[in-house]
Amino acid sequence: MLTFRADDRVLLLAIPPVPDLVAMARTLATGSVVALGTLEEVDNARRDMIEFDNVMFLQASPERIPWRDQFFTKVVVPPHLERLLPDISNEIHRLLAPGGTIVNSGADV
C-alpha cells in the first residue's frame, strides 16, 4: 500500500485503475497526481476522473516525460516498468524534487 501526504506531487508512470486514482485524489487534498498512458488510456481516464481537479493525464512514455525539472515528490513505478529503470533513471531523477522518492506500486497497472 502506498502512503501519500496531502501535499505530495505524484507522478504515476502508468495509469492505475479508477478506484486507486480516486483514493489518491482524495488523499492528495493539496497535492496532485499526473499519470502517463497511451492516447486511449488518457482519454478514458480523463472521462472517468473529470470531477477531480488535482488529477491530470498525459499521453507520454516514461522515456521522455514532458514536465518541468524537480517537480514531483514521489514517482510511482509499477512492476511491469521496473525493468526500464536503468534506461529511465536519468529522466525520473530530473523530475524528482529534492528529497523526493521513487516507489514501487506493488501492483501492476
Regions found by a protein language model. Name each.
Residues L12-L13:
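Class I SAM-dependent methyltransferase core
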Residues P86-T101:
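A short glycine-rich, Lys/Arg-flanked "PGG" loop and its adjoining helix->strand segment in the class I
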Residues M1-R9, P19-A23:
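Conserved alpha-helix/loop element of class I SAM-dependent methyltransferases that forms part
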